[in-house]
Amino acid sequence: MNQEKNREPLGLNGLPSHDYFLDAVNHIDQAVTNKSIAIGAAKGIIYSITETLGSMIGDPDLPSHLRSAYEGALEVAHELEAKIARLN
């Protein structure tokens, strides 16, 4: 069943809500748990997500409310990255 979530659309600055990143991390977490993704692929995707979030957080023009939300998403991604590393 596909449930519609209330997500913030792209903001006026063109940046996505942190929910999109959290959804991606949760999707990879579920795939790893269900063993429906190769560990190497999961590592690569999570690496890309953490690098993207890190770059966005490093932007000095990023509004503080977005920075805080992205930092939270980055922390969740780092936790999954550590979980995947323990599986290897």
Question: Where in the sequence are the language-model features?
Answer:
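Short intrinsically disordered terminal tails
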Residues: 1, 84-88
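Long, low-complexity or tandemly repetitive, helically biased scaffold regions used
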Residues: 2-8, 55-58, 68
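N-terminal acidic leader/helix
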Residues: 2-40, 80
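Charged, low-complexity interaction regions
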Residues: 33-41, 58-65
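Short E/K-rich amphipathic alpha-helical oligomerization segments
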Residues: 41-59
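Short, charged, amphipathic alpha-helical segments
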Residues: 43-47, 64-72
